[in-house]
């Protein structure tokens, strides 16, 4: 199936959450039990990756929410020129890919979709960074391979400057 068969849409009642399994129980449970509540409470928005021929089957998902980072937490080169103590951004709270889809490069596609989404938001809002809290060292390396930087050595919190990202 080609990449053109993939689409990202907001999570809705038509999506089959019960069939999704990424291999990490907390991420599976979030999608099934918490994502809709977070939307209703305006805490996060969940977006799902599906295939056009099977729009109900969730291939992967990510969540976005407003976030800010203390200026002194950013590396010096990333903080340069910012006159405020807090830097506006977006948090990828969760990013997960169904186990049946792993190993096909779709994780990178899903992350790229989230980054592009944030770049579109940046046109209308003041956003400087995209932040993620990796669940493991392996996940942190995945984000690093995709342009994210750690806040500090050994940290599982990473960021991507939205300054030069364009949709």
Feature-to-residue mapping (PLM):
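Short glycine/proline-centered loop/turn elements that form peptide/ligand docking sites
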Residues: 111, 136-139, 155-162
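Cytosolic beta-strand hydrophobic patch enriched in CBS
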Residues: 46-52
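A short, internal acetyl-CoA/4′-phosphopantetheine-binding micro-motif in the GNAT/acyltransferase core
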Residues: 93-103
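Conserved active-site alpha-helix within GNAT-family acetyltransferase domains
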Residues: 119, 125-129, 133-153
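Conserved acetyl-CoA-binding loop-helix of GNAT-fold acetyltransferases
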Residues: 103-117, 145
């Amino acid at each position: 199936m080609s990449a053109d068969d993939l689409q990202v849409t907001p999570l809705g009642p038509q999506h089959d959450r019960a069939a999704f399994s990424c291999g990490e129980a907390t991420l599976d449970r979030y999608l099934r039990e918490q994502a809709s509540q977070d939307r209703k409470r305006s805490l996060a928005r969940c977006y799902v990756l599906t295939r056009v021929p099977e729009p109900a089957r969730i291939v992967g998902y990510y969540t976005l929410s407003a976030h800010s980072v203390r200026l002194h937490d950013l590396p010096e080169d990333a903080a340069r020129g910012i006159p405020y103590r807090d830097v506006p951004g977006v948090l990828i709270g969760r990013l997960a890919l169904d186990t049946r889809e792993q190993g096909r490069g779709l994780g990178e596609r899903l992350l790229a979709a989230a980054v592009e989404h944030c770049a579109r938001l940046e046109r209308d809002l003041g956003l400087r960074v995209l932040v993620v809290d990796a669940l493991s060292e392996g996940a942190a390396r995945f984000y690093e391979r995709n342009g994210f930087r750690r806040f500090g050595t050994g940290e599982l919190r990473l960021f991507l400057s939205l300054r030069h990202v364009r949709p």
